[in-house]
Amino acid sequence: MALPILAVLVFFLVLPIVMIVTVSFWQATEFSIIPAFDLENYEFLFGSNVTYKVFFNTFKYAFITWVFTLSIGFTVAYFLAFHIRSLTWQIVLFLLCTIPFWTSNIIRMISWIPFLGRNGIANSTLISWGVINEPLDWLLFSDFAVILAFVHLYTLFMVVPIFNTMMRIDKSLIEAARDAGASGAQILWNVIIPLTKPGIMIGTIFVVTLVMGDFITVRFMSGSQSANVGRLISNDIALLAYPSASATAVVLLLTVLIVIGIMLRFVDIRKEL
């Protein structure tokens, strides 16, 4: 029984990674790719200031998106788990949260463009209310637009694991804390949050890995004025520089694995899996 599963994992997970690592050591010319062991791609990658700037942008997007998705996701999950008593209404409201995911990421992302544009709904409304006199140019094709799109796209990935963890919390623990005289804030901080840490960590892994590997959102929502690692890899692929793209992908993969490894040292998520 385990052999077919192992074969699937090797074929669809291990083998592609091995191929990417292998190609990252090859050489590329204007006309061909030469299979050879060479560190030139990594030397160029780590010797370029652009690499460090792009990785900084990637971590910046991941961190800011994580802060907002965690804040929104925890609030929504808390409301569904502890303020909605009816299971039917919990299911209905949870399904409402998933409605945007019935369309593709690109459609949901592009839907912000007419809203945030210079002559879009947001600027027109603010001008009509007298809040501003001139349209705000930074609403679209900026880091603000990129992060807004990320939060919109990936908040549900934070809501689901947190909500799942909260639903497993024994309500008698909360009642016992309340009977002991604990305030709502104390119950939240000392009971709910510690018991929700595995769900928070799973959501964090989802959001951080998705943001760090994304390139379409940065391309469209920044107007090609910003870049992250995913965009860097995409550009290399467009130029048929597959060895360079593979080297960048390997570094990104190792970076994500290190980040996840650090996070897993603080929270044991095995009980949630």
Where are these regions (language model features)?
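N-terminal signal-anchor/first transmembrane alpha helix
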Residues: 1-19, 92-97
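Transmembrane alpha-helices
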Residues: 7, 11-14, 152, 158-171, ...
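Short membrane-interfacial helix/loop motifs at transmembrane-helix boundaries
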Residues: 13-49, 115, 119-120, 219-224, ...
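Non-cytoplasmic
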Residues: 16, 20, 107, 114, ...
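Membrane-interfacial helix termini and adjacent extracytoplasmic/periplasmic loops
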Residues: 39, 109-151, 185, 221-225
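Interhelical loop and adjacent transmembrane-helix boundary motif
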Residues: 42-50, 211, 215-262, 271
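Transmembrane alpha-helix signature in integral membrane proteins
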Residues: 49-82
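C-terminal transmembrane helix and the adjacent membrane-cytosol boundary/short C-terminal tail
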Residues: 80, 163-178, 246-273
